[in-house]
């Protein structure tokens, strides 16, 4: 995925923004265009249900019409039928989620999909290690077992054919009572072992210092879901007693746009889409 390659070359991270509706996506893209930032629109199959295929079709249109480089990515999917249909539907990337499997089975699942994906010019993201929605109740040993083991990275990537690697370094999905603490030394070790772009899931709860340190150690894509979903939902809810629908939607788009602008600023991707900016390659990505 050219957007990710460009981010790695310039030492920045691109936001991977999960969206649930075309209207929410429009607000996200408006912020990206205003900031001249490349962006990845992501769809989680479990989050949108039967709307997945029409949503992908609509997002493809929005992505292609954007004035900045925008990629379309299927997030967290372990179903081969769904993954193959997404590849045929015109996505730019798929995340083959074999994180519940042992390392060997995970690599075999990713490799099975990668054959079709690469033939279609689609990038493949894999996850080594496993993230949780919360760290509550984990023993130290259990938490350690979930983390990406640096010694497994090279063999896993060789066997799987993955183009991007999502790492588990203490990051968690969703909101947590206590901000997660990243194992930055583990991340640095992983980064020294591979040139494959690294991905960080669960980016919403991280403080700026940890985020900056992760990007400096090779993270090129950071997934953001919770804060964008919350902003859009708050925009929908914060209306008058008898609102006009168009006004409600406009407010929600503005709210998610503001949240996206903050994400772009934090990740350092503003201006990367323009010729003469930090990455000429990214301006030519699409």
Walk through the language-model features, giving the residues of each.
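Extended, intrinsically disordered, low-complexity segments
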Residues: 236-286
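Glycine-rich beta-strand-to-loop/alpha-helix junction loops that act as flexible
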Residues: 201-204, 224-225
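Alpha/beta enzyme core
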Residues: 1-10, 20-46, 55-69, 77-193, ...
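Short acidic, glycine/proline-enriched helix-loop-strand junctions
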Residues: 119-122, 196, 241-244
């Amino acid at each position: 995925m050219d957007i990710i390659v460009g981010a790695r070359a310039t030492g920045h991270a691109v936001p991977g923004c999960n969206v649930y509706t075309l209207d929410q996506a429009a607000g996200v893209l408006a912020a990206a265009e205003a900031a001249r930032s490349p962006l990845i629109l992501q769809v989680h199959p479990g989050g949108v249900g039967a709307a997945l295929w029409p949503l992908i079709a609509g997002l493809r249109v929005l992505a292609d019409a954007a004035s900045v480089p925008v990629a379309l990515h299927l997030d967290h999917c372990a179903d081969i039928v769904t993954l193959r249909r997404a590849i045929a539907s015109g996505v730019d990337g798929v995340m083959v989620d074999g994180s519940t499997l042992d390392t060997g089975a995970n690599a075999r699942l990713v490799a099975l999909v990668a054959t079709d994906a690469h033939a279609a010019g689609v990038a493949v993201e894999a996850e080594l290690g496993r993230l949780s929605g919360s760290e509550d109740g984990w023993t130290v040993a259990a938490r350690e077992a979930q983390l990406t083991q640096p010694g497994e990275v090279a063999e896993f990537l060789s066997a799987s054919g993955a183009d991007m690697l999502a790492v588990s370094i203490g990051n968690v999905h969703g909101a947590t009572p206590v901000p997660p603490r990243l194992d930055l030394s583990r991340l640095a070790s992983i980064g020294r072992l591979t040139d494959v772009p690294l991905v960080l899931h669960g980016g919403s709860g991280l403080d700026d210092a940890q985020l900056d340190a992760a990007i400096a150690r090779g993270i090129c894509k950071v997934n953001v879901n919770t804060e964008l979903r919350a902003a859009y939902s708050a925009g929908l809810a914060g209306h008058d007693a008898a609102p006009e629908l168009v006004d409600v939607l406009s407010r929600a788009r503005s709210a998610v746009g503001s949240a996206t602008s903050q994400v772009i600023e934090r990740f350092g991707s503003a201006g990367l889409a323009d010729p003469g900016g930090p990455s000429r390659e990214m301006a030519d990505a699409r």
